[in-house]
Every structure is written in C-alpha cells, then in structure tokens.
Swiss-Prot record:
Catalytic residues in the record: 70
Gene Ontology annotations for the cellular component aspect, listed alphabetically: cytoplasm
GO biological process, one term: unsaturated fatty acid biosynthetic process
Protein name: 3-hydroxydecanoyl-[acyl-carrier-protein] dehydratase
EC annotation from Swiss-Prot or TrEMBL: 4.2.1.59, 5.3.3.14
GO molecular function, a single term: (3R)-hydroxyacyl-[acyl-carrier-protein] dehydratase activity
Pathway named in the protein's UniProt entry: Lipid metabolism; fatty acid biosynthesis
Cellular compartments annotated: Cytoplasm
Pfam short name (any one): FabA
Classification via HAMAP family: FabA (MF_00405)
Keywords: Cytoplasm, Fatty acid biosynthesis, Fatty acid metabolism, Isomerase, Lipid biosynthesis, Lipid metabolism, Lyase
Superkingdom per UniProt: Bacteria
Classification lineage: Bacteria, Pseudomonadati, Pseudomonadota, Gammaproteobacteria, Alteromonadales
Chain's role: Necessary for the introduction of cis unsaturation into fatty acids. Catalyzes the dehydration of (3R)-3-hydroxydecanoyl-ACP to E-(2)-decenoyl-ACP and then its isomerization to Z-(3)-decenoyl-ACP. Can catalyze the dehydratase reaction for beta-hydroxyacyl-ACPs with saturated chain lengths up to 16:0, being most active on intermediate chain length.
C-alpha cells in the first residue's frame, strides 16, 4: 500500500482508475468531477483531534468547465463542488489507510459559505481534520473542513461523513 504523505494530480487520476491503492480501494472521480489537483499533506495522526489531516489544492483557471455554465454572465464556482471535494478527500483518506470498497457521501452536519471562487482566483486550498474513524462492519470517516481561496477562508463544513461499502446495490 502507498503510504506517501503527498500526491500529484497524476496519482489522483490513477486513484480514480483504481490503480493507486488497489482495485478494491475507494476511487476518486475522474475528469471534470475531480476537484483536486494535488494533496500536499496527508497523515493519520495530525489535525485538531490527532486522528489525521489532509491539505489539498485546486488550481483555478478561467477556462474551468463550470465557469462557462454557472452562470453565463456571472461566472462562479458552484459551492456544491467545493463541498464534494471535501467528501472526495475523506474517501481518499480512508483508501489511503487501507479501506476497501466503494466510497459514498453519507452527510454533513453544517455547511457555511462566506465567499466565492471567481475566475480571477488562483488557488483553492482544502484543509480537513479527521474527527473519527470507524473500522467495523461499516467503515466510515468523519471530518471537519475549511476551503480557502487565495488564502481566505470561504467555506466550512462540520461532520463530513463518508462510508466505504463492499456492496452498494441496496443503496
């Protein structure tokens, strides 16, 4: 298993194809839905709760697909994409720790949007701290997160929940 503490875009895409941690590990989305360009820090003992943390980045470019359709004369990154990136990172963390199965977002406690990502921004940074890890019949990660644009916090989310399932047919 790859226990590196940072990952490039190429490695994240490899994860999306099931080839980073193994064919049965949780996958990241690929292509336009992958909202992460790199993970600059990941560990299993850091963060506010001492259970792990992740720092990741997305480079902003005016040509990103969502600026062309959200909205035509008022381009802004949809808030749901930032939230989804946070869930993506919780699932990635569980795969990095060795979980096997398919990742599914299970919920979030509270989300706050206090800013926006516009086409002239340069970089989004996601900072997650793992609050709880469950490795029983149900594998689940719970995290708190913030999203910054060019160093300014604009989103926060508490109790992001992601489960890892070996069978999703009854979902």
């Amino acid at each position: 298993m790859n226990k590196a503490n940072s990952f490039s875009k190429e490695e994240l895409v490899t994860c999306g194809h099931g080839n980073l941690f193994g064919a049965n590990s949780p996958r990241l989305p690929i292509d336009n839905m992958l909202m992460i360009d790199r993970i600059t820090k990941i560990n299993d003992d850091g963060g506010e709760f001492g259970k792990g943390e992740i720092v990741a980045e997305l480079d902003i470019d005016p040509s990103l697909w969502f600026f062309g359709c959200h909205f035509e004369t008022d381009p802004v990154m949809p808030g749901c994409l930032g939230l989804d990136a946070m869930w993506q990172l919780v699932g990635f963390f569980l795969g990095w720790e060795g979980a096997e199965g398919k990742g599914r977002a299970l919920g979030v406690g509270e989300v706050k949007f206090t800013g926006q990502v516009l086409p002239d921004a340069k970089k989004v940074t996601y900072k997650l701290t793992i609050k709880r890890k469950v490795y029983r019949k149900l594998v689940m990660g719970i995290a708190d997160a913030v999203m910054e644009v060019d160093g300014r916090e604009i989103y926060s989310a508490t109790d992001l929940k992601v489960g890892i399932f070996t069978d999703t047919s009854s979902f």
